[in-house]
Regions:
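A residue-level marker of the well-folded mature domains of exported/periplasmic proteins
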Residues: 2-7, 21-323
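Repetitive helical segments and hydrophobic/amphipathic motifs
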Residues: 11-12
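C-terminal motif of bacterial Sec signal peptides marking the signal peptidase cleavage site
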Residues: 16-20
Length: 323
């Protein structure tokens, strides 16, 4: 499996860009991103097509989930003749993500595809972007502002599936009671909140105790520390709500040397697949970020061409990946 490449390029569209919001430009239009931004500021461009820049703003630039989402967006951009500028904070940070939105508007983005880290925090910036005529499309995690369309996993249903998979494994091992640890990202990210809600619903009336969730901010090292603490409490299972928390949980189970702790999580990465192959994680709920990225670009182009998408919410699906 190929190793993940962290994206840490700086945005070169405007001299006024501040630090904290990373970006990666991939030329899909004939001109460079810099000249496209300059021309966008000076002249009118077609609703969609050559010279049209769409900003893709994810929660961070590190998780393989976002890298794959960007790959899907870039492929669609090439097919549709637009430019997608990938912009993301170095880490999951509301202030940096807001900065990315403001930078995108200043750079002349006609549309913004966004995965909101904090739905409330980013909403004002998105409203200001809309007031400037920028089209908004959500992928993975929406904010609290009406958008052209949303493409995401049915996170509550997928979370319940994760819980059901853990229950089946516990039952097969003859475990009918015990404590379950839950590692989430934060209290605001809607997608992860829904995953936890769905996961907990699977255990209702099943005789297990789900411990109070702990927040690892999507960071694998922090999540591993949380998982290690859960393990010292004697948990029989640990659920990770995203890539970082799942990786951390698997690494903690591996480091503990203990058998019988069932680890279940979300997202697909080389690290997670390796932990599954080695038996430290039972399974992961693999989303389809490439589909989210591609559909997001397609929706932006349609909206810029005047089509009404009606704020439709589309489920991009999930698969259970096991050994």
């Amino acid at each position: 499996m190929k190793k993940m490449l962290a994206l840490a390029c700086s945005l070169g569209l405007a001299a006024s860009l501040m630090t904290g919001c990373n970006s990666k430009t991939e030329d899909v239009a004939a001109s460079t991103a810099a000249s496209a931004a300059t021309e966008a500021a000076k002249t009118e461009t077609p609703a969609a097509g050559s010279g049209t820049m769409i900003a893709l703003i994810t929660m961070d630039s590190i998780d393989q989930h976002w890298v794959t989402l960007n790959e899907g967006a870039q492929k669609a951009a090439g097919e549709l003749g637009v430019t997608v500028q990938f912009m993301a904070p170095n880490t999951k940070d509301d202030a940096q993500q807001i900065e990315c939105v403001n930078n995108a508007v200043s750079a002349g983005a006609k549309a913004i595809i966004v995965a909101a880290n904090g739905p409330d925090a980013i909403s004002s910036a998105l409203k200001e972007a809309q007031s400037s005529g920028v089209k908004i499309v959500y992928v993975d995690s929406p904010a609290n502002v009406d958008a052209e369309a949303t493409f995401s996993t049915d996170n509550k249903a997928a979370g319940k599936t994760a819980g059901e998979e853990m229950l089946k494994a516990l039952s097969a091992a003859g475990v009918t009671s015990g404590s379950i640890g839950v590692i989430n990202v934060n209290a605001a990210t809607d997608s992860c909140v829904m995953r936890e809600e769905g996961f907990r619903s699977a255990f209702e009336g099943k005789g297990f105790t789900l411990l109070e969730r702990q927040y690892g901010e999507g960071d694998a090292a922090k999540s591993q520390s949380i998982a290690e603490n859960y393990i010292t409490q004697g948990v029989v299972g640990i659920f990770g709500c995203n890539e970082g928390s799942t990786t951390g949980a698997g690494n903690a189970i591996k480091a503990s040397g203990k058998d019988g702790i069932i680890g279940v999580g979300f997202d697909k990465s080389d690290a997670i697949l390796g932990l599954i192959d080695d038996g430290y994680l039972l399974c992961t709920m693999a989303q389809n970020p490439d589909v989210m990225g591609a559909k997001g670009v397609e929706a932006c182009v349609k909206a810029l061409e005047g089509d009404s998408l009606g704020g439709a919410v589309s489920d991009t699906g999930v698969s259970v990946l096991k050994k």
